[in-house]
């Protein structure tokens, strides 16, 4: 349950009055490290958060509203569609970003999450991305967001390896594109 909010406050209030579930999470489509992410408990709270975002930022980037699920944060890093790292971010607060979580651990992908990751990678066509998930109490997964500029530093001992994988992937892609252009010339 994710939807794009209108760019005027009267319409925002009308949109969220139709919500059947609060609290909801609000976030700008552009942000980093949990900035421009907040939670609202009712329609008035949503309007206040939107105003706050608009006052804090130079631009009025679109804002999305998302179902709130109390969950740890599950990050999956993919390079070229391949899962190269998982990081479970635990936090006592409702917001479990890489900057607020102090400990990370790996987690195993279940069959359902593997299917979702495959669909997400196919749909977004981003070579290197971090995909964030939450988990409902019933065990079902919720896609929170896809980051096109993901962090590589959840585990210090993997940082160098991940950078090398990313560079190898990008180099191979650049070579394939160059060859493809050459083939078209002939």
Describe every region a protein language model picked out.
Residues 31, 70, 81, 136-139:
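Short strand-connecting beta-turns/loops that link adjacent beta-strands
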Residues 66, 74, 126-138:
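A short glycine-rich, hydrophobically flanked beta-strand micro-motif that places a catalytic Asp/Glu
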Residues 35-124:
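Phosphate-binding site of ATP-dependent enzymes
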Residues 1-36:
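A conserved helix-loop-beta module that forms one wall/lid of the active-site cleft
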Residues 29, 68-69, 77, 132-134, ...:
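Anionic group-transfer/hydrolysis microenvironments
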Residues 6-10, 68-71, 127:
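Short beta->alpha connector loops
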Residues 24, 64, 84-85, 129, ...:
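Protein kinase-like catalytic core scaffold
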């Amino acid at each position: 349950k994710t939807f794009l909010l209108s760019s005027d406050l009267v319409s925002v209030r009308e949109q969220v009055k139709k919500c059947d579930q609060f609290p909801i999470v609000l976030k700008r489509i552009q942000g980093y490290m949990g900035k421009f992410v907040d939670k609202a408990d009712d329609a008035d709270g949503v309007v206040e958060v939107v105003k706050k975002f608009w006052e804090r930022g130079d631009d009025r980037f679109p804002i999305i509203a998302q179902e709130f699920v109390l969950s740890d944060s599950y990050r999956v890093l993919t390079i070229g569609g391949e899962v190269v790292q998982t990081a479970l971010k635990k936090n006592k607060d409702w917001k479990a970003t890489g900057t607020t979580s102090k400990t990370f651990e790996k987690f195993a992908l279940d069959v359902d999450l593997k299917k979702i990751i495959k669909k997400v990678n196919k749909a977004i066509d981003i070579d290197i991305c971090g995909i964030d998930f939450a988990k409902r109490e019933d065990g079902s997964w919720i896609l929170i967001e896809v980051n096109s500029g993901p962090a590589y530093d959840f585990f210090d001992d993997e940082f160098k390896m991940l950078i090398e994988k990313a560079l190898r992937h990008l180099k191979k892609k650049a070579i394939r594109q160059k060859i493809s252009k050459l083939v078209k010339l002939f």
